[in-house]
Amino acid sequence: MDYFQDFIAALSNFIKKDNLKIDVPMKNHTSFKVGGPVDVLVMPEKYEEINRIIELCEKYDVNYYIIGNGSNLLVRDGGLRGVAIKLLKLNKLQIGNNKIIAGCGVPLGYLSRKARDKSLTGLEFACGIPGSVGGAVAMNAGAYNGEISNVVESVLVIDNKGKMKRLYRDELQFGYRSSAILKHKYIALEVTFTLQKGDREKIANRIDDLMRRRIEKQPLEYPSAGSTFKRPVGHFAAKLIEDSGLKGKGIGGAQVSDKHSGFIINKNDATAKDILDLIKFVQNTVKSKFNVELDTEVRIIGEDK
């Protein structure tokens, strides 16, 4: 216990009191609204603080997890042993003629609207994606025929040796829901976007149209992590799930949405185990019916209860 207190004391030397919390329910920090407690939640306000936190974790042999706004995250019911480093306070935004520099904690929807306000086109597709910039660039988030990779010029990262460096587009190895950042477990700090000048009214109309389509077709009224599964090559996950007769299928408080089969939702006070059991059931059913493997798009971390 003294060892843990020493670790907390070392963190509190440079992390503001309000940005350092003990024994925090992760369900309050994920869009699924499930998950057990994390031992320590820390919210750095400067890039340099991240390195210092990681150095302390290594010194005291403490696990750490990098999280954004938790919109693509499922934390198991036993929670997280160690430290969750939440990057949402790294949210500076600079807008130039056709460039935007965004901190990793900037919400994507906010970024999309700011681009619209400056008559910059290229980020309309991101208007309804609930993630933040750091997670979005790491997984090359996309929707409605748009992807983050189409508009990224460079990303400032912390590499796995703790060094800060800038990766340019050709070094980022973007693929479907993947990048060099994800592959090498780098931490995305700041992204430079290159956009095009456009007609503000057309940009606004496109955003309005995409938001309307989202509201009509997605179960936004329930907690979820967006699309639960990646798109398998040559197929659509939602169609495979629906054709397997799983639309509306529930386990505990979790359900395959009857509005969009690609979403597993927290319909009625689900546990993480309910959601994980339903994910496994869907994967097994689709595999047995169509011989197609469904890989999860959502990131799953933590311990079972």
UniProtKB/Swiss-Prot annotation:
Main localization category: cytoplasm
Domain FAD-binding PCMH-type: 33-198
Keywords: Cell cycle, Cell division, Cell shape, Cell wall biogenesis/degradation, Cytoplasm, FAD, Flavoprotein, NADP, Oxidoreductase, Peptidoglycan synthesis
Cofactor(s) this protein requires: FAD
Active-site residues annotated for this sequence: 177, 227 (proton donor), 297
Keyword Cell division set for record: yes
Gene Ontology biological-process annotations: cell division; cell wall organization; peptidoglycan biosynthetic process; regulation of cell shape
Associated pathway: Cell wall biogenesis; peptidoglycan biosynthesis
One family name in Pfam for this protein: FAD_binding_4
Residues passing through the membrane, by range: none
Location relative to the cell: Cytoplasm
Reaction equation(s) it catalyzes: UDP-N-acetyl-alpha-D-muramate + NADP(+) = UDP-N-acetyl-3-O-(1-carboxyvinyl)-alpha-D-glucosamine + NADPH + H(+)
EC number: 1.3.1.98
InterPro entries: FAD-bd_PCMH, FAD-bd_PCMH-like_sf, FAD-bd_PCMH_sub1, FAD-bd_PCMH_sub2, MurB, MurB_C, MurB_C_sf, Oxid_FAD_bind_N
GO cellular component, one term: cytosol
Gene Ontology molecular function terms on file: FAD binding; UDP-N-acetylmuramate dehydrogenase activity
Protein's job: Cell wall formation.
Protein family (similarity comment): Belongs to the MurB family.
Stated name of the protein: UDP-N-acetylenolpyruvoylglucosamine reductase
Source taxonomy: Bacteria, Bacillati, Bacillota, Clostridia, Eubacteriales
Gene that this polypeptide is encoded by: murB
